[in-house]
Design a protein with these regions (language model features):
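Catalytic cores of Mg2+-dependent Asp-rich isoprenoid enzymes
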Residues: 2-101, 110-121, 140-149, 160-175, ...
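Cofactor-binding active-site loop characterized by glycine-rich and histidine/acidic residues
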Residues: 107
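Acidic/His metal-coordination segments adjacent to aromatic residues that form catalytic metal sites
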Residues: 122-135, 212-214
Length: 294
């Protein structure tokens, strides 16, 4: 039986506490941007955020864990089954799944966006080109905007907090920036998230990118994506009044988008070789400033 303390914060002794602790440790190591941002949320609500973000990380890294699409499909189907089984299904042994299902129950989270996130990640398993810019924005919405929206529901403790349009723009800006940061790894394993319509406009093919010979066309294509990310940032800023203070920690990691974009515009940036990151101090400073301004 879940104790009251465990129900609130996931901190009581027992399997659920261990599951939430696993999520926090995983996030601290694998996704420090979201982890540090989550520390600005009320302490009792952080475990729910950690469960959501750890789930997103687990699903996102399926491609890295398999060498063929079929085993990846099996792993994603396992997550679908976990979500569809809910409380009525057998208790999963996976700590992230345990924490996620408890978070869904405690905060009455809808299953559809979680399932949609899993479904969107099927694209990652294959080396198909991203067909168009609208397709890329849709992918970003399902994998990133939906996650922000779910985090808002946790922070609002299951009530509708508003801010859905803001979450949409925030998620797209964050996802586009993340994909550009991951460009070296994606290109090395044959994945191209730059939309085919943008590549065609700049005279680049998928084959050019995976063979490391994109040239100026790749630079122009990435420049277009940076401009698009900033458009979504501006739209988010225009909608800031629609975001209640209680749910702003869900948006906090988006404060790191502009520093990342600026790092990509520095002299010497090479999309195939440059690793775009922030020092822990720079990350803390950017998030602290954004939290104070919220």
């Amino acid at each position: 039986m879940t104790t009251e303390t465990e129900h609130r914060a996931g901190t009581a002794p027992g399997p659920l506490s261990q599951a939430y602790a696993h999520c926090a440790a995983l996030l601290r190591e694998a996704d420090p941007d979201r982890y540090v941002a989550s520390l600005y949320a009320p302490e009792a609500l952080r475990p729910g955020l950690h469960a959501l973000y750890a789930f997103s990380h687990e699903v996102a890294r399926v491609r890295e864990q398999v060498s063929e699409p079929l085993p990846g499909e099996v792993r994603l189907q396992w997550w679908r089954d976990v979500l569809e089984g809910g409380e009525g299904g057998p208790a999963p042994a996976h700590p992230v799944a345990q924490a996620l299902l408890d978070t869904v129950r405690r905060f009455r989270l809808p299953i559809a966006p979680l399932s949609g996130l899993v479904e969107a990640r099927v694209f990652d398993l294959y080396d198909d080109p991203m067909p168009s810019l609208p397709d890329l924005e849709g992918y970003a919405g399902e994998t990133s905007s939906a996650l922000i929206r779910l985090a808002c529901l946790v922070l609002a403790q299951g009530r509708d907090p508003g801010g859905a349009a803001a979450a949409g723009h925030a998620g797209v800006a964050y996802a586009l920036t993340g994909l550009m940061r991951a460009f070296p790894w994606h290109a090395a394993r044959g994945q191209v998230y730059l939309p085919a319509d943008i590549l065609a406009r700049n005279g680049v093919t998928r084959e050019d990118i995976v063979r490391g010979r994109g040239g100026p066309g790749v630079d122009y294509s990435l420049k277009e994506l940076r401009a698009l990310a900033r458009i979504h940032l501006r739209k988010l800023n225009d909608l800031s009044a629609t975001v209640p203070a209680a749910i702003r920690p869900a948006f906090l990691a988006v404060a790191l988008v502009e520093p990342y974009l600026k790092a990509m515009e520095r002299r010497g940036y090479d999309p195939y070789r440059s690793i775009i990151t922030l020092s822990p101090l720079r990350r803390q400073w950017a998030l602290w400033r954004a939290a104070r301004a919220a």
